[in-house]
Amino acid sequence: MRALLDTNIVIHRENVRATNLSIGQLFHWLDVLHYEKIIHPYTVSELRKYSDKQIQSLYDAKLSAYIQMKSIAPQTAAFTNLLNDAPMTDNDRIDNQLLCEVYCGRADILITEDRKMRVKAERLGIADKVFTINAFITKAVSENPALIDYK
């Protein structure tokens, strides 16, 4: 299984200070359930836009921990027709492309904290494949109670 991680998830994980205390549990469950943690080329580009060179260097050093997608899925007419009313800022274009990767089946799930992306996922019929950090943890725990470590 392949879990595509939105830029905000990578930032939560690799930040110098904790910004979401559930991020460790998310990565624990991704590992326990043998998900490949993949990132999109657009995520790499976004992380390299940071003006703080020290933060940018930190992210560059940690990106090798993820599998980077080598190509970008073409957006089909069916896909774009479902989203044609969405405003097209640079962030919207990136979000739409990440959703397209799931829509096209190149990733099994997408994990994001972006509410707008989850709304778009509903329009695309892939809401069951787009999770927040806590929603994925809840699903993992409820579907795999035998794997919970109660220590």
Language-model segment annotations:
Residues E14-R17, D85-N91:
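Short, flexible loop segments at the rims of nucleotide/cofactor-binding pockets, characterized by
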Residues M1-I39, Y50-S57:
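Short, well-structured N-terminal submotif of metal-dependent ribonuclease cores
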Residues R93, I111-T112:
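Short beta-strand scaffold positions
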Residues I9, T43, Q97-L98, K116-M117:
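Alpha-helix capping/helix-boundary segments
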Residues W29, E101, K120:
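Hydrophobic/aromatic ligand-binding patch that stacks against planar heteroaromatic rings
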Residues E36-I39, T43-I72:
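Short, surface-exposed acidic-centric catalytic microdomains
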Residues M88, G105, I109, R115-K151:
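Acidic, PIN/NYN-like endoribonuclease modules and their adjacent C-terminal/linker elements
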Residues S64-T89:
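Acidic catalytic patch
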